[in-house]
């Protein structure tokens, strides 16, 4: 990105001192954010492309955003919407992890994943299909999940939790089964905003699957996690923790932090197109959980190596944010359903999706 345009991408840092903070603590807090602002701007200035991001620490008021409400191409990050819909369906008894889905001859598609190399017909459990979709971003598995739950139902689910700009358009590398919106040509497989993708990942991390009994329609009041919720979220969060592609958000965090013990400290889902690299992640810092949704697009580097500039830029931004907010490093022991954050502990004061 050219330095002359930098002002258009300056991050908005929301870190207001809450009532009761001492002056010394408030000054130190702002000093951290000032340093983070400088570092983020330097990373942006060096990148040959565009950047949109949203990050928030869930148990504090740390927040950073750059074009966070701008609709962007999600690439495979839209698969998080499929995962969340599946989680709710399993929790409500309309789907089961061990139900069988069959990949028939001629249904496999190429690109990321491995199922297109397998002989067909092939029978897989729903859990296996979703695991392949998340861990290796398998496109064939994604289409199997879409066939199971339906595009309209998946989109209705995201809309019901306040994600108005998050939309799955079609199956991967398959013709659309009906008319497509006019903006399909711009976004391809799916669209969202960094803020909405972060909110979706937060729903998964907090294990918010059910509305409060009697909650008015359209409200984001979720029931506290119970044992049945946790059982579902344990499975889904395990998929995200075992993400195979770790060259973006985890890249410098895991290699630099030797204090992580007792579990994986990052759960994430990546997305890639020729000119797009993206990652949406939960990062468990010793100071508390963070959600990051970082999108680079219109990138000059179209290469498909681990040193692609978009991937490295995401890694640098993630390291800057996490290091500023959790100088002590990561803590994998806390990456469990609910994220160890009590109801009402987030910066929003509710735990509801923050629009």
PLM regions and their residue ranges:
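Acidic helix-start/capping segments at beta-turn-to-alpha-helix junctions
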Residues: 58-59, 97-114, 148-150, 172-176, ...
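Active-site SXXK
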Residues: 61, 72-101, 292
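Beta-lactamase-like hydrolase cores
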Residues: 26-70, 320, 324
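Active-site-proximal loop and beta-strand segments within enzyme catalytic domains
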Residues: 88-131
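Bacterial N-terminal signal peptides that target proteins for export
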Residues: 1-13
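Mid-domain, small-residue-enriched loop/turn segments at the edges of structured enzyme/sensor domains
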Residues: 50, 122, 143-225
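Structured C-terminal helix/loop/strand segments within mature extracytoplasmic catalytic/sensor domains
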Residues: 29-41, 148-150, 200-355
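Bacterial N-terminal signal peptides
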Residues: 11-22
């Amino acid at each position: 990105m050219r330095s002359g345009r930098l002002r258009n991408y300056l991050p908005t840092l929301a870190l207001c001192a809450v009532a009761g903070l001492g002056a010394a603590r408030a000054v130190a807090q702002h000093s951290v954010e000032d340093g983070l602002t400088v570092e983020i701007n330097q990373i942006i200035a060096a990148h040959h492309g565009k950047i949109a991001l949203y990050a928030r620490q869930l148990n504090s008021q740390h927040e950073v955003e750059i074009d966070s409400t701008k609709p962007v191409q999600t690439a495979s990050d839209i698969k998080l919407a499929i995962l969340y819909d599946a989680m709710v369906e399993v929790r409500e008894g309309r789907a089961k992890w061990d139900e069988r889905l069959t990949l028939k001859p001629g249904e496999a598609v190429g690109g990321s994943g491995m199922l297109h190399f397998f002989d067909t017909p092939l029978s897989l459990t729903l859990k296996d299909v979703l695991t392949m979709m998340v861990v290796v971003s398998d496109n064939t598995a994604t289409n199997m999940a879409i066939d199971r739950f339906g595009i309209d139902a998946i989109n209705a689910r995201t809309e019901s939790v306040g994600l108005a700009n998050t939309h799955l358009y079609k199956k991967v590398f398959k013709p659309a089964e009906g008319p497509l919106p006019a903006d399909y040509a711009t976004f391809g497989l799916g669209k969202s905003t960094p803020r909405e993708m972060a909110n979706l990942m937060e729903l998964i991390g907090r294990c918010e699957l059910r509305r409060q009994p009697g909650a008015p329609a359209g409200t984001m009041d979720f029931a506290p996690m119970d044992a049945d919720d946790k059982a579902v979220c344990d499975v889904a969060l395990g998929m995200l923790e075992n993400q195979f592609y770790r060259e973006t958000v985890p890249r410098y965090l895991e290699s630099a932090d030797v204090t992580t013990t007792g579990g994986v400290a990052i759960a994430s889902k990546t997305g890639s197109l020729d000119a797009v690299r993206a990652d949406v992640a939960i990062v468990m810092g010793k100071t508390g959980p963070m959600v990051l949704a970082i999108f680079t697009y219109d990138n000059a580097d179209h290469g498909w190596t681990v040193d692609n500039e978009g991937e490295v830029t995401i890694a640098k931004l993630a390291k800057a944010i996490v290091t500023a907010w959790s100088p002590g490093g990561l803590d994998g022991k806390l990456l469990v359903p609910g994220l160890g954050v009590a109801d009402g502990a987030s910066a929003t004061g509710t735990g509801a999706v923050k629009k």
